[in-house]
């Protein structure tokens, strides 16, 4: 592993050791915690290791990582990160900017392979009647337009909100799916994506 940096060697060995000992790989966040780096930093190390030929990722398998060098006898298949889970989304910044990313999460293959896919953690009960609960992970495909009736993520005054989209003659109407709450009517909402899936951890 002469072409890997010392940190990259440690990351590669940590993944291999974890799979051998536990039967499953560490998460991006666990890699970051292990080495005192951010989730994005851990992800960057994985991509650098891939470029040097030690691992191969497969986009149609939620970024499965196959170890190629020095591990042929183990034939390990490591499922690592899937899509970025965003924290606060700031107006004016690229939606997938590094500072927005909290960690990477694995999701079903048919969702992870869609271009521009990211995840947001649902806060509150404004969409509960649509089966979307507080704490759920909303899987979003990046888009700046929407059709009436689609569930979208819209940015309003630096706050991301998940609502049902409707276009009115002179404004946008964002409807909750909670009878206790009123629709939001605004001219200043920015559509950043539409809901394509929901991920719930029990």
Swiss-Prot record:
GO process terms (BP): DNA repair; DNA replication; negative regulation of DNA-templated transcription; proteolysis; SOS response
NCBIfam families: lexA
Catalyzed reaction equations: Hydrolysis of Ala-|-Gly bond in repressor LexA
Enzyme Commission number(s) from the entry: 3.4.21.88
Residues under site feature: Cleavage: 91-92
Self-association and partners: Homodimer.
Record keywords, A-Z: Autocatalytic cleavage, DNA damage, DNA repair, DNA replication, DNA-binding, Hydrolase, Repressor, SOS response, Transcription, Transcription regulation
Stated name of the protein: LexA repressor
Catalytic residues, chain numbering: 126, 163
């Amino acid at each position: 592993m002469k072409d890997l940096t010392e940190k990259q060697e440690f990351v590669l060995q940590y993944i291999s050791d974890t799979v051998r000992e536990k039967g499953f790989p560490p998460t991006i966040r666990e890699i970051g915690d292990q080495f005192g780096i951010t989730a994005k930093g851990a992800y960057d190390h994985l991509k650098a290791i891939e470029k040097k030929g030690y691992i191969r990722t497969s986009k149609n398998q939620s970024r499965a990582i196959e170890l190629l060098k020095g591990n042929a006898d183990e034939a390990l298949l490591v499922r690592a990160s899937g899509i970025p889970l965003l924290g606060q989304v700031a107006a004016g910044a690229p939606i997938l900017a590094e500072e927005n990313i909290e960690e990477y999460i694995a999701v079903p293959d048919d969702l992870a392979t869609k271009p521009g896919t990211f995840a947001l953690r649902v806060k509150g009960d404004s969409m509960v009647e649509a089966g979307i609960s507080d704490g759920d992970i909303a899987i979003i495909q990046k888009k700046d337009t929407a059709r009436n009736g689609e569930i979208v993520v819209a940015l309003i005054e630096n706050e991301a909100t998940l609502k049902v989209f409707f276009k009115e003659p002179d404004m946008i109407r964002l409807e909750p799916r909670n009878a206790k709450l009123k629709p939001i009517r605004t001219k200043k909402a920015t559509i950043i994506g539409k809901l394509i899936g929901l991920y719930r951890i029990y």
